Amino acid sequence: MKFDASRLKDPSFFAENRVHAHADHIAYANLEELSIGETSLCHSLNGLWKFHHALNAAQVIPGFEAADYDSRGWADIRVPAHIQMEGYGAPQYANVQYPWDGYQDVAIGEIPTAYNPVACYIKTFFVPEQMADRRVFVSFQGAESCIAVWLNGHYVGFAGDSFTPSEFELTDYLIEGENKLACRVERWSAGSWLEDQDFMRMSGLFRDVYLYAIPKAHIADLHLKTLLDDSYTDAVLDLSVQMALDPSVGACSVSFELTDGGRLVASAACKAEASLHVQLPVKAPKLWSSESPYLYDLLLTVRDADGRVLEAVPQRVGFRRFEMKDGMMHLNGKRIVFKGVNRHDFCTDSGRVVPVETLRRDLLTMKRNNINAVRTCHYPNSSALYALCDELGLYVIDETNMETHGTWETIERGKRDIDYALPGNRMEWAPMMLDRVNSMFQRDKNHACILIWSCGNESFGGDVIYEMSRLFHRLDDTRLVHYEGIFHDRRHNDTSDMESQMYTPVVGIRKYLAEHRERPFIMCEYTHAMGNSCGAMSDYTEYAYEEPLYQGGFVWDYIDQSIRTKDRYGNETFAYGGDFGDRPCDYNFCGNGIVYGDGEESPKMQAVKYNYQNIIAEIADTKAVIANRAMFTNTGAFDCVAILARNGEIIASAPLETDVPPMESREYALPFARQTRGGEYTVTLSFRLKADTPWAQRGYEVAFAQGVYAVQEAPKHERYAPLRVVRGDFNTGVHGEHFSVLFGDLKGGLTSYRWGGREMLKSIPRPNFWRAPVDNDCGSNMPQRYAQWKIASMYAATNATPELARLNAHPVATENADGSVSIRYIYGLCTQPDGHAVLTYTVHPCGQVDVTLDYNPVEGLGDMPEFGMLLKMDADYDQIRYYGYGPNENYVDRREGARLGIFKTTAKENVSRYLVPQECGNRTGVRWAEVTDHRGRGLRFASGAMEFSALPYTPHELENAMHDYELPPIHYTVIRANLQQMGVGGDDSWGARTHDEHLIDVKKPLSFTFSFKGI
């Protein structure tokens, strides 16, 4: 048999001599190996391989796979790795469009020929001594997009699924001494039409490669089921085993032992046969869930007639029952709510080559932020993910390697008819797709974490996908099947067991469920977290507890798919689509993570953690109603600490014993009386881990709630020297003890504020109506719709018209009865129709300056992004201390997770690391903020409850940069004090607008007052 490269465009050519898919358990040669976790039956081939890069199939070196071909002149390459990350070609980011679109006219199933890189690998090895006289196989855990394999010049086989193992038997071709393993990996093959996922397009051997040997009596496959009775009390562990038995081995036995922390729970033994079926009754097992991921240990031991161990196979077992009950999804008898996230298998330094420690970091971050579910968008992940999800407690939607968005998008746009869909009704593609279903199922079937199988993503509908769903059901009666595409194509509506949609607003979900009550509803993608986003997420999360049929969703998505690199000056930066010269591309649309590319949490995570927490409370002065949204865990499992603060300063704390059963609520008296001393009080309930867990240490906060009340304070009366007003020809000065304020007639505004002899202002404060557009703004054309407000922010002036110039030529300083002095300016906003704003400064003898901005609505002028003031201070004033909502940035539609308190930050730290610079760093409900230098000198800003930000850049500088390295050098600190900024939105990033309730109402007069004073 020979490899026929011409078949790469044949959808029926997806496996040749490939080993049948099987479970991902690990086998050990004896119990001693098992005890130390090192198996002699496996030998890694990771490391350096010889490598040749061809731009297309025609440039592949003929005969490179021959045993006598000399590859010493080839380069070395690391395995596992994407070749594009090793300097061969470049990553290409594309969302919907196929990566070859526009370069070559390629029909469905065909592949590009002019540019379709081929990676040729050679690895020499000696068969490890412990594998001698055994059957030997090679496993490629991930080869993108397909792989052909040779050993010592003999063609071994072919496989064409990038994301499930490609395994081949090598036994017949092994020789004594050095063996030569050669393989050829095409960047694109027929299967690539099914791999149009929204990710960085790369290729190569990107997961582990290893040899494994099997003993003469071998557990080739294992399928376990945990069958709970209808009371969810007792269980049967149902085991189906397939064995590979060499005729020479003689009589063998297999023992089954289920243990719990070393204690034997159940056992059985039987004669080894090709197929075995064993059931182990288990009384009252501890059940597995995200809240309590309890795992038992199953050990299968194969022994020969003399009792000698031939093989030992361990398997973790989580007892759980997932089912459709009363029209809803239930786990262990309880209605489940998915608090999930979509996760691409991605590492900023190596692409889809994800080290286990990076994977663990991701999952620990999820657990710490109350995420309970993962959707493996949109392909099977490495086996390590499922083992860790079993251990840590994360529910999984395991998704088949299928996305053909680039084909059905043309149907949606009306360019093609329905028959163009892939796989659609093209039954010639069915064998490949059913094979992908089977490969994923067989590998992953024993993981307790997997509750739902998914047929794939964004591939429209049709007969083929329906058959995929049917195959899942035939293979597994313990899980449900998911497919979102039925929303677009209802021909096979029962392809999915649940209604699944993407980015439908809550009002749309309500409407759908009002008319369709036959099955539950989930959002497999929602809250598109591109850039500064996740606004109004709570609308979705709260709805899950209002509508039983709505059972949660999965945020899009977990991590920015950005690649760590250097700018031209050697500074670290994170690159996105188009930065590699890749075209076509979709630029920064890969930056949708609630964590940055390096795994650091973005400010959005603050809201995600809060919206997903299982304990909520409503606090009123001296009592709290605590609601427990957990399925199985009493609130008594956590320490609850009540914290009392006055004006942001903690004055008392005390434990509060709670005992709220799952899905119930109870009222508790707080350990503090209502305070009588004047001030603003916060009562915070903090729920914390009582003991260390695998994902966080004792004392870690898993949930909090906060109540606020105020007690009237008596006004303070302090005496200061009277103000001295100097009315010059071109300036008006207002002077007091230790400070001086100057208003300029020529420049039309506050030109100077000196405190203690130091000038505090870098420029004249200005009315501001603009923010740097966030990604959601750009997707909804906000810059175009609101452009007049950008112009107003840049060019509003007191001399915008001759009439205004006359009115503002000699502003009058009015001396008020309380000893203060006021001066007023009228700004023309340069809008069409004309708009005006009135800015009034009032200087008090203490040195405080009140700033009031007034705006009267103008018919024909639309919503404004922001209403407030902008001023600059020297960059030395970069230390921020404030009393408001924090600690991370927050907005009117993303304040969940922020708490009222006193926080510290810096202007530079306030710049969030979104891939494209945009609005960031805002804080809501700010009572006061101090902007100082390192010696504590600066300005204190105050208001009742303003929005506030302090950044090193203006909104326009942020807007003008497409990368962080395009931002200018830091010269000042930009203060923006606002009545309000519009919300950031987040329903999607390509058209959805900020919800009306989170916009600034410009149909009514707007007035905003804040003050500043030197410190």
Q: What is each PLM-predicted segment?
A:
Residues 85, 90, 95-111, 160-162, ...:
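An acidic-aromatic loop/edge-strand motif
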Residues 195-219, 570-619, 629-649, 662, ...:
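Catalytic cores of secreted or luminal carbohydrate-active enzymes
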Residues 268-284, 648-678, 687:
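Intrinsically disordered, low-complexity Pro/Gly/Ser/Thr-rich segments with frequent PxxP/GP/PP motifs
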